[in-house]
Amino acid sequence: MAAPVEQTIKLQIKGGQANPAPPIGPALGQHGVNIMEFCKAFNSRTEDRMGTLLPVEITVYADRSFDFIVKSPPASVLLKQKADIETAAGDPLRDDAGTVTWDDCLDIADQKLQDLNAHTVEKGASMVAGTARSMGITVEGKPAHE
């Protein structure tokens, strides 16, 4: 029988670059998790996505063992990559940070569909387009009915 769940920890870590420094070390250390074991497991599982910010959900059990789930990168990170920008607009209503196409939004939604609260790729793309607008990124070619 598996040990009961003690805690669920949510972090955002760059793929392949987990180390015991903050924020990982303190977050795991206070629950008694072997930090180096987590870092090695995370880095080996995410070496193909080196440097990309990845949300991870760590489940800590009462016997101090753990499991973790690596999710897809945040839509904001993927939008910045597609728009080829470093940061979003400070004031999205006045400043234009960049431009993406509707097809870019569809690609991002397809990649994130399992993590989005949407049933179809088109609805997910609408959510991604909303994130883009809140970042000051213009979405070109969006269908009128969407």
UniProtKB/Swiss-Prot annotation:
One or more lysine residues are methylated. GO terms for cellular component: cytosolic large ribosomal subunit. Keywords: Methylation, Ribonucleoprotein, Ribosomal protein, RNA-binding, rRNA-binding. GO terms for molecular function: large ribosomal subunit rRNA binding; structural constituent of ribosome. InterPro entries: Ribosomal_uL11, Ribosomal_uL11_bac-typ, Ribosomal_uL11_C, Ribosomal_uL11_C_sf, Ribosomal_uL11_N, Ribosomal_uL11_N_sf. One of its GO terms (biological process) is translation. It holds the Pfam family Ribosomal_L11_N. HAMAP family: Ribosomal_uL11. NCBIfam families: L11_bact (TIGR01632). Belongs to the universal ribosomal protein uL11 family. Part of the ribosomal stalk of the 50S ribosomal subunit. Interacts with L10 and the large rRNA to form the base of the stalk. L10 forms an elongated spine to which L12 dimers bind in a sequential fashion forming a multimeric L10(L12)X complex. This is Large ribosomal subunit protein uL11.
